[in-house]
Amino acid sequence: IDFMLQSSLHCKVPNGAIDITSLFINLNASTDAPHFIMEFIQGSPTSMVVLLDLLPRKDLALHPEYIEKYYEDTEVDKQRKIIEQLPQARPYLSPSLFVRSAFSPTAVFFTIDCGKGGEGTLEEIVHGHLASVVKGILQIWLDTCASDASEMEEGEREIMVKRDRTVRSKSIEVDLTANLPRMFGPDVSGRIIAEIRKAFGVQEG
């Protein structure tokens, strides 16, 4: 493991509050195994956005064996289908084309909306189906990715490291730099982003 970043952000907005809980576990260059990403964005007591993925570190179209090893053989897509089958769930499409392109085909990207008066239903889903899916994907990552070591040529490793750095930097630009100032103001958001850049090992572009 290269580093782990856990964050919980709470922001009051005119019609309520937004809570964002994130967990990023990034692996180092001794392996090409996927990173682990989890993020929950709750904008109301009855709805939330769920993002879960084993974030690929290679171009999947160029490396079908990578898909087979980490996504097909592990049957991780079964976890996505559990959420997909919930009547309250609908696919979440990020407004960023970069974000959509960076994640795997098995990513759990859903909005769960339980409607008016659905606080209890959302809580049941979070503690039931969602908790089970999170545990399932994390266990797959721990079993298949966390302790994996990969033999790579030096040039291949350099490409992977560069890709990792680009994804980290672009993610900060697309997600945090664009949204945090509106939530917390320039001073607080600037300090948060600076610390995250430091953790991610990327410089301001």
Swiss-Prot record:
GO terms for molecular function: red chlorophyll catabolite reductase activity. Pathway: Porphyrin-containing compound metabolism; chlorophyll degradation. It is found in: Plastid, Chloroplast stroma. It holds the Pfam family RCC_reductase. Disulfide bonds: none annotated. In etiolated and green primary leaves. Low amount in roots. InterPro entries: RCC_reductase. It catalyses: primary fluorescent chlorophyll catabolite + 2 oxidized [2Fe-2S]-[ferredoxin] = red chlorophyll catabolite + 2 reduced [2Fe-2S]-[ferredoxin] + 3 H(+). The N-terminus is blocked. Keywords: Chlorophyll catabolism, Chloroplast, NADP, Oxidoreductase, Plastid. One of its GO terms (biological process) is chlorophyll catabolic process. It is an enzyme of class 1 (oxidoreductase). Substrate binds at residues 39, 175. GO terms for cellular component: chloroplast stroma. Its EC number is 1.3.7.12. The record marks 103 as: Important for substrate stereospecificity. Homodimer. Catalyzes the key reaction of chlorophyll catabolism, porphyrin macrocycle cleavage of pheophorbide a (pheide a) to a primary fluorescent catabolite (pFCC). Works in a two-step reaction with pheophorbide a oxygenase (PaO) by reducing the C20/C1 double bond of the intermediate, RCC. This is Red chlorophyll catabolite reductase. It comes from Hordeum vulgare. The lineage of its organism: Eukaryota, Viridiplantae, Streptophyta, Embryophyta, Tracheophyta. The gene is rccR.
